[in-house]
């Protein structure tokens, strides 16, 4: 990267770090513990979310992704170290820094490439539990060990966060309250480069961001636009982007294929309708899955040493 590009990155990141907000992007350790306790009190004993929250180590089985992204489990997952060259794991008390070996390798590759682009370091959010499966809090997917949330906040340059900071600090919200656009001073060329690099990784199936962030990427990209196809609008995702890898395990099912094109036209515009941004009415609570709702092999994953 040339001097002028690096200078632009540095300026953008310096501005971004001035806008850290007090509102938490994710629950801190105490809030998470309280939420988990409340969920556990309400769940039946056979709820899959309860069962998969117990194991503290991965299943000693060959690595595999079993089932669907929102109804499955992970065999032979490995742990992403809390610290590495170019990344730091956030909210480590959750023990959600596990994934398929392909996911761990992809995170490390993204961290290395992003540093070359001038991003100081990745702050890695939730991956999967040691054996995947449904989680007590926070996610409908993240069950196969093939997904990771990457904060849209860069790591501080030149230092490691303390354990307290990792448990307590907030990510930075890039999207304005009306959900119609990003804050122009917060979405920087560095963010565009990070999303581009992630989308161009061959194992990545798709990336979820808020529609306002997708829109900002669409209008900011002046070069080759094919990578934008993988960047998909979704509700929330104003503080982080969600990376999902392709599943090559015959025991799992991939999502539907992504439509052709860069996704910057009519299919994006619908996300800015008021009824989509702020839906009215109560949502039906999701079905409480039991182990019987998951693939049979997930029982073997739970029972494995």
For each of these PLM feature ranges, what is it?
Residues 48, 52-55, 106-137, 208-230:
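Extended, low-complexity, intrinsically disordered C-terminal regulatory tails
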């Amino acid at each position: 990267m040339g001097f002028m590009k690096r200078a632009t990155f540095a300026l953008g990141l310096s501005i971004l770090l001035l806008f850290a907000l007090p509102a938490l992007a994710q629950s801190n350790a105490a809030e998470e513990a309280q939420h988990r306790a409340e969920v556990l009190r309400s769940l039946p004993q056979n709820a899959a979310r309860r069962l998969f929250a117990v194991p503290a180590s991965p299943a000693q089985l060959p690595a595999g992704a079993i089932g669907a992204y929102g109804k499955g489990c992970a065999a032979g997952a490995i742990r992403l170290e809390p610290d590495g060259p170019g990344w730091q794991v956030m909210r480590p008390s959750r023990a959600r820094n596990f994934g398929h070996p392909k996911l761990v390798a992809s995170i490390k590759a993204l961290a290395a490439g992003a540093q070359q682009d001038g991003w100081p370091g990745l702050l890695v959010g939730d991956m999967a539990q040691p054996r995947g499966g449904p989680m007590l809090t926070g996610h409908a997917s993240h069950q196969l060990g093939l997904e990771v949330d990457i904060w849209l906040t860069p790591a501080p340059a030149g230092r490691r966060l303390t354990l307290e900071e990792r448990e307590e600090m907030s990510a930075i919200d890039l999207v304005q309250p009306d959900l119609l656009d990003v804050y122009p001073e917060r979405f920087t060329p560095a963010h565009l480069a990070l999303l581009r690099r992630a989308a161009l990784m061959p194992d990545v199936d798709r990336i979820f961001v808020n529609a306002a962030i997708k829109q900002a990427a669409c209008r900011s990209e002046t070069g080759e636009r094919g990578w934008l196809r993988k960047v998909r609008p979704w509700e929330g995702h104003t503080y982080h982007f969600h990376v999902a890898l392709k599943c090559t395990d015959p025991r799992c099912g991939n999502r539907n294929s992504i439509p052709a094109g860069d996704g910057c036209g009519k299919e994006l515009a619908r996300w800015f309708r008021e009824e989509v941004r702020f839906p009215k009415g109560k949502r039906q609570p999701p079905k409480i899955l039991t182990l019987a709702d998951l693939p049979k092999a997930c029982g073997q994953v739970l029972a494995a040493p």
